[in-house]
Amino acid sequence: MGSDKKTTEEKRKHKRNSPSSPRDEVKSKRQNIKGDEERRKEKDKSKKEKHKSHKSKCHSSEEKKSGEKHKTKSHKHKDKSKNKFEELSKDDYFSKNNEFASWLKDKKNLFFSDLSSETARNLFSDFVIQWNKGKLDSQYYEGIATGPRSSHAWNIKK
């Protein structure tokens, strides 16, 4: 029985002294963690350096793009100052009807009352194109109070 105690005590001692004891395992894990952290830091540094150089290249191209954008913005601004009118769409048929009727008489030699609604809409789309290009006379952009509606010469006596 005494020999049984020795063997278990020896086993305990042997376990404590062996490199695979719990304390040694913790130490070796800590060392591995430190080594891993150092390796990670080195990798992160190299990635950051690569990223910075890549970033600087992108930055230079972004500057070029932003410069181009500024040029186009100023160019658009010049266009807006040159053409002080709002762009029209087909939906502005009723709001710009006086201008459209005047344009029909002046440019197409037609009267608004002589047209069918479909023909008037088609001609209005031509008017919108000319308006948006800025090719119309300034009187159209300034606004017209009343436009010629029919070819009939109204003779209203007061």
From Swiss-Prot:
Composition bias type Basic and acidic residues, residue spans: 1-11, 22-47
Keyword Chloroplast: no
Top-level lineage group: Eukaryota
Keyword Cytoplasm attached: no
Tissues where this protein is expressed: Specifically expressed in flowers pistils, especially in stigmas and styles. Barely detected in roots, stems, leaves, sepals, petals and stamen.
Assigned GO CC terms: nucleus
Region of interest (Disordered), ranges: 1-88
Matching PANTHER family: STYLE CELL-CYCLE INHIBITOR 1
Name of the protein this chain belongs to: Style cell-cycle inhibitor 1-B
